[in-house]
Amino acid sequence: MTEHVATRIKRSASSIFHLAPEDLAFQKKVRVFIDQHVPQGMAMWTQRGDWFKALADQGGWDVPKWHKDFGGPDFTPTQRYIFDLEMGKQPTPPQLPFGVGMLAPILMNYGSKAQQDRFLPSIRDGSVNWCQGYSEPGAGSDLANLKTKAELSADGGYYLVNGQKTWTTLAQIAHWIFCLTRTSSDGAKQEGITFLLIPMDDPGVEVRPIITLGGSHSVNEVYFTDVKVPVENRVGEEGKGWTYAKGLLAHERSGLAGIQNSVMGLEKAKRNAQKVRVGTGTLLDLPSFKNKVGVLEAELLALEFTELRTLARVAAGGDPGPESSILKLKGTEIQQRITELNLEAAGVFAAPWGAEAFGPDFAHGATQSYLGGRATTIYGGASEVQKDVIAKNVLGLS
């Protein structure tokens, strides 16, 4: 039976749903827009500004998760799903997630009017890059154990920040960092945590690169030495940062599922497998390989429905909730398994590292993608942490 799973699981959640006429019209509108505006090839990088302007001109499509009060499109859950699905069907210019998808919801919910007016416009147009200052050497999965200290000055005008963050993604290009700091050690460790916004060009901020297993430089260590942060850069109340961070982590984890990218990546892996001759057929014809593909397609379909339930909760005014841990856990596992399929298809041609490529074009970089993908089940909360969250908050286990 499993040999035929791949041929039976062909539908996405959208094809199972009976879309209302207005949703079908919206889907057509998105498809026409993509056909007319998406840059191709290298233009994806040189014409990024034009792409995002065109999205903005559609009424907030450049910030699809934002509320209409802040310039977002106010999509229904179904429209949001359709939009993500259609945008994920082909490569589109990337938008860094830290400002638009992570910090912005915190500012909208907990920031002052002055902070919203100051930061949201530059977050939206991409002129200012942000990074996330959460993890520390002794506070990764146990994030509430963080030690970076922020002391309020005697006159109450600024915080003096000292400490270290690690695994800080894209800190090397960030203009600002939103940072969890400890302002008090009294009470439970989740208490006394304060959410600060810190400029990266302060002379007391130092960024040191970390080269990952895949050979890339995307994460860093960030050191703070006597950094003065004006009190107006504090988001919300002092000592309430943990509450704000939990909401941000839920948004981050649901976004890390990367469902549409996985759908596109799996289709690419299938095309690659069709190029590999095995006996009288192709690698994709092998029952063992076809079964792996079919299982992934089935799991992706299940994950799509979980995402839709999460979107419906958010649209009703709630947080993503503990189900975001399911999205993060399964979504990142699927991402890793797709890199394994590409590695299997590349075979011995994936072996060269930094040397001149040979063999099929898709083989070059397959090993780097596989190794780099090992981190997906760690960042944003390790899989073990997500399982604990699911056990306690979804299954009700103690």
Predicted feature residues:
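A structural signal for short hydrophobic beta-strand segments in well-ordered beta-sheet cores
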Residues: 148-152
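C-terminal helix-coil-helix/basic helical segment that borders enzyme active sites and/or dimer interfaces
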Residues: 39-46, 278, 287, 301-358
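A short, Trp-centered hydrophobic/proline-enriched beta-strand micro-motif
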Residues: 126-134
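N-terminal glycine-rich flavin-associated loop
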Residues: 95-114, 140
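Amphipathic, small/basic residue-rich leader segments at the start of a protein or domain
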Residues: 1-97, 108, 118, 122-125, ...
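Glycine-rich beta->alpha junctions and the first turn(s) of the following alpha-helix
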Residues: 17-19, 205-303, 376, 392
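Glycine-rich phosphate/cofactor-binding loops in nucleotide/flavin-utilizing enzymes
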Residues: 2-10, 78, 82-83, 102, ...
